[in-house]
């Protein structure tokens, strides 16, 4: 089945439209008809009525006007695109791409990178320009200084150039650096000297500690009960030796005479003993050097007060009581053996040997125990 609109196709159009409509109305009685019947109707038409297609008819004009009205905007876009493409072909772009989307994106990226590179280059140029400006300003200041100096020296009959001024400045800087180096070397040498002094002080303090330990050990060997009688006996023997021989008072002579009278003979000196005897005083008994020294406490301010009186090596001044006659029986008779040491040893000392000799108070020295 074919619709009636087929009649309006260009194949059935002719110049005499009225005749064609009459013939169609005679043969076509309904809206639809079979195709074969239409073919018969078309074949019955005369040949002069089918001279070819005619584009000047009213239907085509209607179609063209509708198309122009509806697609006016599309036609304007097409014309603009054609104009742009024509202009691009005439004036080639600087990027050199073919107009595709990927190429355009790449070109935009490259343009951005190029702009960033241009920014970096501009920043570098600005920094270089600032550096050059600072250098030029420094040179101008130096030139001003040199001109002022030259004017001042020209009045006084002198003349200086910029090179001489710079040379003097460099010499001053070198002298300042040399002084700083010498000061640093002096500080380092002073630190080394202070370290050496500190080591020497430590060695001296250790020697003092050893000496105090030896003195403490020698004092501790004598019992408290025998300290005061021993001191009195030593002084009496010294007084007797002085009256008999006429020699001045020396503690080591007193110790020798006391040992001879008590019948105590010292052992023969050995090599180690002789070496130690040279370092220590002559009054130290030999039995005190053979035994090791015990550990002592730290040195204190009371060590000088505990030193026995027989350690004094300088002679006492002469007095008027030197010509007194000492009874010999007090010097020759030994003291009785004492009891074990106790707190009341000083009170139990026999007074007959202490009070029998009229010693002068300046000559009488009692140890502090």
UniProtKB/Swiss-Prot annotation:
It comes from the Eukaryota. Residues 325-346 are annotated as: Disordered. It holds the Pfam family NPIP. Belongs to the NPIP family. PANTHER family: NUCLEAR PORE COMPLEX INTERACTING PROTEIN (PTHR15438), NUCLEAR PORE COMPLEX-INTERACTING PROTEIN FAMILY MEMBER A2-RELATED (PTHR15438:SF5). This is Nuclear pore complex-interacting protein family member A2. It comes from Homo sapiens (Human).
């Amino acid at each position: 089945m074919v619709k009636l609109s087929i009649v309006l196709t260009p194949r059935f159009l002719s110049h005499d439209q009225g005749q064609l409509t009459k013939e169609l109305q005679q043969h076509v009685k309904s809206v639809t008809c079979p195709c074969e019947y239409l073919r018969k109707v078309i074949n019955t038409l005369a040949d002069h009525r089918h001279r070819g297609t005619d584009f000047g008819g009213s239907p085509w004009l209607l179609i063209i006007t509708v198309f122009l009205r509806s697609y006016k905007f599309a036609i304007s876009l097409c014309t603009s695109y054609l104009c742009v493409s024509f202009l691009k072909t005439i004036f080639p772009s600087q990027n050199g791409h073919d107009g595709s989307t990927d190429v355009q994106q790449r070109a935009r990226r490259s343009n951005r990178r190029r702009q960033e590179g241009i920014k970096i280059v501009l920043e570098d140029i600005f920094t270089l320009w600032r550096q050059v400006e600072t250098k030029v300003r420094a040179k101008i200041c130096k030139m001003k200084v040199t001109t002022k100096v030259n004017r001042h020296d020209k009045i006084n009959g002198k003349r200086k150039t910029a090179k001489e001024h710079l040379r003097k400045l460099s010499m001053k800087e070198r002298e300042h650096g040399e002084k700083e180096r010498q000061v640093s070397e002096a500080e380092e040498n002073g630190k080394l000297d202070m370290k050496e002094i500190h080591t020497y002080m430590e060695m001296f303090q250790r020697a003092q500690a050893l000496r105090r330990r030896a003195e403490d050990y020698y004092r501790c060997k004598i019992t408290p009960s025998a300290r005061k009688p021993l001191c009195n006996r030593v002084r009496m023997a010294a007084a007797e030796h002085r009256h008999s021989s006429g020699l001045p008072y020396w503690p080591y002579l007193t110790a020798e005479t006391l040992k001879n009278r008590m019948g105590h003979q010292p052992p023969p000196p050995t090599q180690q003993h002789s070496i130690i005897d040279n370092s220590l005083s002559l009054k130290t008994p030999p039995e005190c050097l053979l035994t090791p020294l015990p550990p002592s406490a730290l040195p204190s301010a009371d060590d000088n007060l505990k030193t026995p009186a027989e350690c004094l090596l300088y002679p006492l001044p002469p007095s008027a009581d030197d010509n007194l006659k000492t009874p010999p029986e007090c010097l020759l008779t030994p003291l009785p053996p004492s009891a074990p040491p106790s707190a009341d040893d000083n009170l139990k000392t026999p007074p007959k040997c202490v009070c029998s000799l009229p010693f002068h108070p300046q000559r009488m020295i009692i140890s502090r125990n």
